[in-house]
């Protein structure tokens, strides 16, 4: 925000250790600088709150009821409600202006404006420049996979990345193909990026129908990246970027083995796919372009204008049918696993 706009922004994190060893760059740690944090909150024109906090009684010890507040959701409402001990209806129906990450979550927040997860392309370029990458046109292909949870694809609709099932399929493939699998989690962000950049292929997530920041970062570094976006998520990406194409190799998990085998057999195809994905990201997910979604939202909130969605949610087309297709994919995945 500070680099690309004239907005003076500070990021206050109440608990930087919330993800354990999976750490990120920080600005202000509230627990280390509570008074500075409260002074910044008091002087701010706008408070951009991530996740849900009570405006009157919250861990920051400040009353936000008279401030311009913009809520920003990163999880589906039931997950937020469970951890905040608040009713789903209170979250979804809250009259304060709302943003929601432009992934699967947006279909459940009809009042929220979808916004992109922005990339620090300069930081990714520095990591790429500092990380040796060996060309392996005929040797073993290296695949990186970094799930943040080990929840099964069969037990949750959204709170999963299908890690157990994905790993079962990859292990089978490794037994008969020139494939090395680098699986990692709970690493500092910069280290995770270096591990990915050393790979030929990256798997984002292939079971829910959504994409994640991990896949965007991989494609920004020119890596061949597999993901699976359902029809609603695809439409949201199109509305956000204006592009009708996708940079992911878009494939559900049950169909991934054939796709991966083709990629493993062809270094030329991997190079082409990686370059195409990188070109798409640099042209359509450029931070300088996409940051306008935030700037416009801030301007609307400060001037008392409602936030406008560019893509309305239809219960049948955007929720019921994608859920039906997901159930079909899960059944096909079960058959795929049983055939092995």
Put a short name on every predicted segment.
Residues 197-199, 217-224:
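Conserved donor-binding/catalytic loop of nucleotide-activated donor transferases
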Residues 93-138:
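Donor nucleotide-sugar binding/catalytic pocket of nucleotide-sugar-dependent glycosyltransferases
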Residues 206-207:
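Aromatic "clamp/platform" in nucleotide-sugar-dependent glycosyltransferases that forms part
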Residues 12-94, 100-104:
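Extended catalytic core of nucleotide-activated donor transferases of GT-like folds
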């Amino acid at each position: 925000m500070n680099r690309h706009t004239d907005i003076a922004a500070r990021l206050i994190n109440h608990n930087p250790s919330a993800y354990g060893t999976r750490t990120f760059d920080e600005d202000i740690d509230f627990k280390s600088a509570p008074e500075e944090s409260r002074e910044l909150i008091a002087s701010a024109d706008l408070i951009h709150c991530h996740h849900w906090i009570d405006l009157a009684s919250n861990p920051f010890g400040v009353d936000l009821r008279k401030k311009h507040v913009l809520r920003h959701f990163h999880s589906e409402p039931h997950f937020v409600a469970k951890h905040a001990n608040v009713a789903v209806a209170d979250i979804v129906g809250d009259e304060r202006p709302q943003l929601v990450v432009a992934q699967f979550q947006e279909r459940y927040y009809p009042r929220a404006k979808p916004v992109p997860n922005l990339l620090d392309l300069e930081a990714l370029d520095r990591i790429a420049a500092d990380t040796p990458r060996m060309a392996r046109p005929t040797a073993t292909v290296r695949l990186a996979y970094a799930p943040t949870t080990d929840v099964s694809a069969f037990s949750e609709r959204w709170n999963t990345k299908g890690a157990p099932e994905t790993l079962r399929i990859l292990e089978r493939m490794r037994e008969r193909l020139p494939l090395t699998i680098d699986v990692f989690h709970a690493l500092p962000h910069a280290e995770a990026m270096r591990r990915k950049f050393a790979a030929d292929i990256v798997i984002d997530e292939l079971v829910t129908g959504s994409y994640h920041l991990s896949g965007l970062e991989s494609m920004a570094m020119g890596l061949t990246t597999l993901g699976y976006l359902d029809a609603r998520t695809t439409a949201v990406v199109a509305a956000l970027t204006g592009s009708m194409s996708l940079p992911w190799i878009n494939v559900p998990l049950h169909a991934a083995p054939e796709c991966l085998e083709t990629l493993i057999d062809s270094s030329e195809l991997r190079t082409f796919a990686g370059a195409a994905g990188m070109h798409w990201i640099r042209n359509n997910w450029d931070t300088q372009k996409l940051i306008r979604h935030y700037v416009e939202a801030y301007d609307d909130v400060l001037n008392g204008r409602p936030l406008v969605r560019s893509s309305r949610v239809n219960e049948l087309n955007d929720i019921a049918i994608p859920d039906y297709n997901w159930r079909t994919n899960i059944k096909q995945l079960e058959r795929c696993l049983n055939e092995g």
